From Swiss-Prot:
Cited SUPFAM superfamilies: Snake toxin-like (SSF57302)
Main location class: membrane
Subunit organization: Interacts with CHRNA4 and CHRNA7.
Annotated ranges, domain UPAR/Ly6: 26-91
Domain of life: Eukaryota
GO molecular function annotations of the record: acetylcholine receptor binding; acetylcholine receptor inhibitor activity
Prosegment location in residue numbers: 116-140
Name listed for the protein in its UniProt record: Lymphocyte antigen 6H
Its membrane topology: Lipid-anchor; GPI-anchor
Keyword Transcription regulation: no
């Protein structure tokens, strides 16, 4: 067992280390007008930024479903919406030429690429892969 003075010194050192660690701001994926989210890169946000945003702009009339993706740090989701739903773009949105989807989140890199498939086949495949070794071990 450590003497009381050593325990006290250890606790004081731990408190100093915890309190002196630099505060790290939010990290978000960052890219502009890309068609592929894998082209986005992590970026440390400014202290005033509180959300990560993803903006997807699509052309609903296109048979190819053309789209562009913008990912960024922002001070608020309302700020992003005001920017992308500006008077200039509203004409295109209201006429059906463009569709704009804005999603915001508050955790590091939460605006990254979507998770692996949400299809029933992806779920079934994952379940089979995880149960496979147990089924083989159980044997006939």
């Amino acid at each position: 067992m450590l003497p009381a003075a050593m325990k006290g010194l250890g606790l004081a050192l731990l408190a100093v280390l915890l309190c002196s660690a630099p505060a790290h701001g939010l990290w978000c994926q960052d890219c502009t007008l890309t068609t592929n989210s894998s082209h986005c890169t992590p970026k440390q946000c400014q202290p005033s930024d509180t959300v990560c945003a993803s903006v997807r702009i699509t052309d609903p009339s296109s048979s190819r479903k053309d789209h562009s993706v913008n990912k960024m740090c922002a001070s608020s989701c309302d700020f992003v919406k005001r920017h992308f739903f500006s008077d200039y773009l509203m004409g295109f949105i209201n006429s059906g030429i463009l569709k704009v989807d804005v999603d915001c989140c508050e955790k590091d890199l939460c605006n990254g690429a979507a998770g692996a498939g949400h299809s029933p086949w992806a779920l079934a495949g994952g379940l089979l892969l995880s149960l496979g070794p147990a089924l083989l071990w159980a044997g006939p």
